[in-house]
Amino acid sequence: MVLSDLDIKEPDSPESGLNGSDDMVREHETESKGNLYSQYEEKVRPCIDLIDSLRALGVEQDLALPAIAVIGDQSSGKSSVLEALSGVALPRGSGIVTRCPLVLRLKKLEKEGEWKGKVSFLDREIEISDASQVEKEISEAQIAIAGEGMGISHELISLEVSSPHVPDLTLIDLPGITRVAVGNQPHDIEYQIKSLIRKYILRQETINLVVVPANVDIATTEALRMAQDVDPQGDRTIGILTKPDLVDKGTEDKVVDVVRNLVFHLKKGYMIVKCRGQQEIQHRLSLDKALQRERIFFEDHTHFRDLLEEGRATIPCLAERLTNELIMHICKTLPLLENQIKETHQRITEELQKYGKDIPEEESEKMFSLIEKIDTFNKEIISTIEGEEHVGQYDSRLFTKVRAEFCKWSAVVEKNFEKGHEAIRKEIKQFENRYRGRELPGFVNYKTFEIIIKKQVIVLEEPAVDMLHTVTDIIRNTFTEVSGKHFSEFFNLHRTAKSKIEDIRLEQENEAEKSIRLHFQMEQLVYCQDQVYRRALQQVREKEAEEEKKKKSNHYYQSEDSEPSTAEIFQHLMAYHQEVSTRISSHIPLIIQFFVLRTYGEQLKKSMLQLLQDKDQYDWLLKERTDTRDKRKFLKERLERLSRARQRLAKFPG
């Protein structure tokens, strides 16, 4: 939809008669005007009202809303353009005039509506009933925020103007770009200003309005270059040429080429306006009169009159264009905004769940609250020790980590017993030489067999205890993480849970270590069921016979020179190794699972439930971290804003 000049300003000057003065024309104008306002109310106003309502809800604290940012080099005419659009005078002077971002919210009223304004900053609101007060209030607001000097601030100043003579727009006036610090300005003033500007123009929800004097080389304009950096295709950038009356004679055609988008291309193109000059301001020329003079200037200008006819010139045409651009931009960004609100709502909901519910005031309610928290914690502990807990995509369950340690233990046992035949035979020969008694050659010395077995088993005791400590640490850390997950916001409860986790760990680890060492003491009693041992021995002998057969088939085979007793001891050792390795590699993990996994978890569960017996401790246990209550309140407020915003968007007819 396209808005006309009538939506912006109703001139009462003689020039208004240029459109016809007879009664038929006036009647037609009145009818057209009524139809236009009807269309405006039906199509344009709902879009503006939607964004205004979201802004009133405070959604801007969470997400960027569609707006227009006005940028330009220092003294490019930014403030003059904003004055002409808003109908109010803004601070002027040399150096940096705009020292804080100024959010100018213009709201068009019906013809009978009265002008009103409001300045908001630093949690202050100042109602204004006279447009002449605006300049003074904005200046005082800037001093209150940025101080008396020439520094700038990121703190926003909001100016709301409601009037029948303004377009529906949201404009953000940003400080003019300066390159050299003067006077008491900070030495890095250029960097500060550019950082502030970039913060706004980076947002995809922002239309960048770049103000450039018509009498300068547009290619050298810093503001246009910054806009191009963040919007290379010019999809959301509009160029505004000012001061056309200062253009050197003979260069007018170049200005026309720029406005017609033939020099520095922008998809949204350019407009050209003529605002009040310094002399006109000193002579107190009203903004209404300035608009009339602007139109006459373009109508009478040989080169620029065509731009007026094309709708590319004057403040009213600019206001119409900006309103339409903002409406189109709102419609374009609404789906994205809706998705952002939905995603943010979901994220805040999940974050709020981490902080739980508010702590109740009633004692009975406190007990139920504590029961709920401890019960949830205990359920996850039990799920964890049973290997059924929920984990992230890149995390592993506790039992998976523990099983990995058990697999390492099995490999250690295998490696210990799978020594090479020569090494074992050498060891047997050494024992024969040292411990052989009065036996004749060929008799097996059972003592030699026992000593070798005991020696090979006992060396596994300390590795078994080391594995116990490793597994216990893994389990203790996991239980502590579960405590942090459920109790992190209640430091006394979390500290109590960690204390119990540590105490029970120490107790269960000691019990497990005693059992492990007891098991290795029992393994010093060389024993195996007869039928089991006979079966193992038979398997070893069959295997050796098969290997001997393969060796004899080899042409280069040479018989090993060994005593029959040595060979027999070797076979017995291998048979017993087979059984004892199976026993140790399985039984030690069973001991660890029983004491430092299952019993550990069950004891922790019982110990946490015992906390419910002392009602005097409820307040202490449920005491929250200092910032938790404030954080929960903050998240609830955000969630409420976003919920209401989703409702508004759902009802929007667009």
From Swiss-Prot:
Disulphide bridges: none
Positions of region (G3 motif): 173-176
Domain GED: 566-654
Domain Dynamin-type G positions: 62-335
Region (G5 motif): 274-277
Stretch list, region G4 motif: 242-245
Bilayer topology: Peripheral membrane protein
Gene Ontology terms: biological process: defense response to virus; innate immune response; receptor internalization; synaptic vesicle budding from presynaptic endocytic zone membrane
Stretches for region Middle domain: 361-528
UniProt region (Bundle signaling element (BSE)), positions on chain: 336-361
Reported modifications of this chain: ISGylated.
Gene3D superfamilies: Dynamin, middle domain, P-loop containing nucleotide triphosphate hydrolases
Subcellular location: Cytoplasm; Endoplasmic reticulum membrane; Cytoplasm, Perinuclear region
Listed SMART domains: DYNc (SM00053), GED (SM00302)
Function noted in UniProt: Interferon-induced dynamin-like GTPase with antiviral activity.
Domain-level remarks: The C-terminal GTPase effector domain (GED) is involved in oligomerization and viral target recognition. The middle domain mediates self-assembly and oligomerization.
Protein name: Interferon-induced GTP-binding protein Mx1
